[in-house]
Regions:
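Short, low-complexity N-terminal intrinsically disordered segments enriched in polar/charged residues
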Residues: 1-28
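A short, structure-level motif marking secondary-structure boundaries and short turns
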Residues: 3-4, 42, 88
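A solvent-exposed, acidic/Ser-Thr-rich amphipathic alpha-helical stretch
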Residues: 21, 27-78
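A beta-strand edge to alpha-helix "cap/lid" segment located at domain peripheries
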Residues: 59-129
Length: 129
């Protein structure tokens, strides 16, 4: 399976809220980097390994209801994949609805995701936390 297909499958599973299934093609030592100021989001920082990545995603799911998860554009760069994603969310604690736009950069090696780097609107994130 090509890297772009692996990432597309992950996004579909995540959109379907199959969080564990979304990570099926992640290496055990996958690195997830969420680029942000940790003072703005408790989810910012780096997760090392599939279990930490899963824990981070489950924590997000506890804080937010994901109403729609839309990969707007996915760019195939061979073993590198870039994507713009639009996430329609509700903060569970406040009921506030918003749309978070993210840029994700994936690295795939030997059919497994080994790294994901995510950038997002930090000002928006700070306003909803």
């Amino acid at each position: 399976m090509r890297a772009v297909e692996i990432v597309s499958d992950l996004y579909q599973s995540y959109a379907d809220r199959d969080i564990e299934g979304a990570l099926v093609h992640c290496a055990e030592d996958v690195v997830f980097r969420w680029i942000a100021d940790p003072r703005q989001s408790r989810h910012a920082g780096t997760a090392h390994g599939k279990q930490e990545f899963l824990a981070r995603l489950l924590a997000l799911d506890d804080d937010f209801e994901y109403r729609h998860f839309v990969p707007v554009e996915i760019i195939d760069g061979g073993d590198k994949v870039a994507a713009q994603v639009e996430i329609h969310m509700t903060r569970r604690a406040t009921g506030e609805d918003f749309i978070m736009r993210t840029a994700n950069f994936w690295t795939v090696r030997d059919g497994e995701i080994i790294e994901m780097v995510a950038y997002y609107d930090t000002a928006l994130a700070a306003s909803v936390f």
